[in-house]
Structure formats: C-alpha cells, structure tokens
Amino acid sequence: MAVESRVTQEEIKKEPEKPIDREKTCPLLLRVFTTNNGRHHRMDEFSRGNVPSSELQIYTWMDATLKELTSLVKEVYPEARKKGTHFNFAIVFTDLKRPGYRVKEIGSTMSGRKGTDDSMTLQSQKFQIGDYLDIAITPPNRAPPTSGRMRPY
C-alpha cells in the first residue's frame, strides 16, 4: 500500500529557520560594498567582473542579522557609529534572464535605535552564497525622514 504525503506549500514556507551551529558550520565570505551618501551603488559598477572599490569582506553565517552586520560595519567605519546613522541593505545578485546584476532592497537599521528589520537574517531574505551585499549609509544629519510624509504644517 502506497502512502502519499499531504504537505502543502504553505506548511513548507512557514517552517521556521533552522538555527545554525556556528561552532560546526564553516562561515561564508560576504562581500559588502558601502556608500556614505545614502544611495546604493549603480548596477553598472558591478559589470564585467568589476566591483566598487569600497569593499569590505566579512566572514559570517547565513543566520547573520542586519543588526549584527551593522555592528561589524561600524567597527570598520567609526563615522558610522554616530547615533541616528541609517543603514539601508540590499542584495546584489546575478540576473539570470539577461547579462548583469539586479538589486533587491531587504531592510534597514539605525545606530542607537531598535528597528523592525534588526533581526532579519540573510537566510530569510533568500541570500545565496556568491551574492553581494550593498549598504547605503546615511549620516544622521542627512538621514531620510522617519515618516513617509513631508508636510509644511
């Protein structure tokens, strides 16, 4: 007698991320590119084997959170430690349909404040080994507005 599995796609998708044992799992090399003007790099800066010059190489795991990555970037760039500095994260990945790269914004963090994206992981955002991480850093004096509205009244 044959037994048929009745697992639905929703059940598969809702399965929580399995914790990674950092003692037993080898870390991956994460190539991070940063800007300090609040904007991500242009995709043509990643063309034909070229990459932006602002590369930071981090050994980490797929369960690394955006807050954890923010802390690592702040260790290297002291000016990013100021309270209110905004970090906007994007994954840069190879476009399988045409030559070049695509970008997918995944979340943001802020120095000195807790945020909803702090606990977001690379794994939860479908990051794959070989992708790049692009971080647009905005200093506190030029930070984007916290609310979506800019009204004079």
Curated annotation (Swiss-Prot):
* Gene Ontology BP term (one): regulation of alternative mRNA splicing, via spliceosome
What InterPro entries does this protein map onto? Answer: Hist_deAcase_cplx_SAP18, SAP18, SAP18_sf
Q: Where is the composition biased (Basic and acidic residues)?
A: 7-20
What's its job?
Component of the SIN3-repressing complex. Enhances the ability of SIN3-HDAC1-mediated transcriptional repression. When tethered to the promoter, it can direct the formation of a repressive complex to core histone proteins. Auxiliary component of the splicing-dependent multiprotein exon junction complex (EJC) deposited at splice junction on mRNAs. The EJC is a dynamic structure consisting of core proteins and several peripheral nuclear and cytoplasmic associated factors that join the complex only transiently either during EJC assembly or during subsequent mRNA metabolism.
Q: Which family does it belong to?
A: Belongs to the SAP18 family.
Q: Where is this cross-link: Glycyl lysine isopeptide (Lys-Gly) (interchain with G-Cter in SUMO2)?
A: K13
Tell me what this protein is called: Histone deacetylase complex subunit SAP18
Entry annotated with the keyword Amino-acid biosynthesis: no
What Gene3D superfamilies does the record tag this protein with?
Answer: ASAP complex, SAP18 subunit
